[in-house]
């Protein structure tokens, strides 16, 4: 049936005309999209769940807030033994206190800065000693820790590029390498939280995009290498969930913008001007107030990647606008996506 469907001309496939508004500038474009059944909605309800978690050990990084915090509570409720890596555990962060308040033997917060090799290795030993049988290994690693920033290339310092990469990319690589021996013993799972911006670049987000593109490549290489060893590697590419992750408050955006402007070379300030700079910051504020506050699609995707007998290579929890934009930017010639999204 599938072969017959794919062999039919596009004019005979179920499709629909879409009026697509570019969220960067308000311009509308009408596209004829085929086929309707390939929308992200078809991947939001997952089947083929494996056996219950039954105490399998999972490490999640970045559990102080956002996706990691929600994942820790959700996976604990599913029966996993959850080790919640928290950057601010030693400082008594509110998120850490809430997780600790559950007072469960199956949910343990641990101090973990993914940029610090000593803390990562200490986490390995803490988890190894917390396993009933270390020789059977650890079932899952969810690389969720990450930071974000904004600013056009000429507005962004090299220090910012390095800082974002150290957490998002090298932190993921460092943590994965350290835990692979335990994961190999369990023939377990690695789930890397990337982003839709790991598949399609976006203006004013180059430091973040670079790191997420890097996670995509790292995950593909790792998946190829781990396949013969029985370890499955998946990537989750969330859409716009900024409103749900508390990455930016209006005050934080203004603080970043002030420092960015103050640190700009004089020639850049003169050539672009304050009006242009302020307009870009205003757009960023609008973007940060948008997006979904319901993270359940991300939580469900990670859960499926950890529990399904045959997890997907990639998961796309995002709304239709961003999913369609990603398909256009990754599957169509660049000239077409440029015509639609660059003006």
Curated annotation (Swiss-Prot):
InterPro entries, alphabetized: NAD(P)-bd_dom_sf, Sc_DH/Rdtase_CS, SDR_fam
UniProt xrefs under Gene3D superfamilies: NAD(P)-binding Rossmann-like Domain (3.40.50.720)
Annotated glycosylation sites: 219
Transit peptide: 1-46
Catalytic activity: (R)-3-hydroxybutanoate + NAD(+) = acetoacetate + NADH + H(+)
N6-succinyllysine: residues bearing it: 103, 259
GO cellular component: matrix side of mitochondrial inner membrane; mitochondrial inner membrane; mitochondrial matrix; mitochondrion
Active site per database record: 209 (proton acceptor)
Binding site residues for NAD(+): 60-84
PTM description: Acetylation of Lys-132 is observed in liver mitochondria from fasted mice but not from fed mice.
Enzyme Commission (EC) number: 1.1.1.30
Subcellular localization, as worded in the UniProt entry: Mitochondrion inner membrane; Mitochondrion matrix
Keywords noted in UniProt: Acetylation, Allosteric enzyme, Glycoprotein, Lipid metabolism, Membrane, Mitochondrion, Mitochondrion inner membrane, NAD, Oxidoreductase, Phosphoprotein, Transit peptide
Residues bearing the modification N6-acetyllysine: 73, 97, 103, 132, 177, 212, 258-259, 280
SUPFAM superfamilies in alphabetical order: NAD(P)-binding Rossmann-fold domains
Subunit structure as annotated in this protein's UniProt entry: Homotetramer.
Family of this protein: Belongs to the short-chain dehydrogenases/reductases (SDR) family.
PANTHER family named among the record's database cross-references: D-BETA-HYDROXYBUTYRATE DEHYDROGENASE, MITOCHONDRIAL, SHORT-CHAIN DEHYDROGENASE/REDUCTASE FAMILY 9C
Name this polypeptide is given: D-beta-hydroxybutyrate dehydrogenase, mitochondrial
Organism encoding this protein: Mus musculus (Mouse)
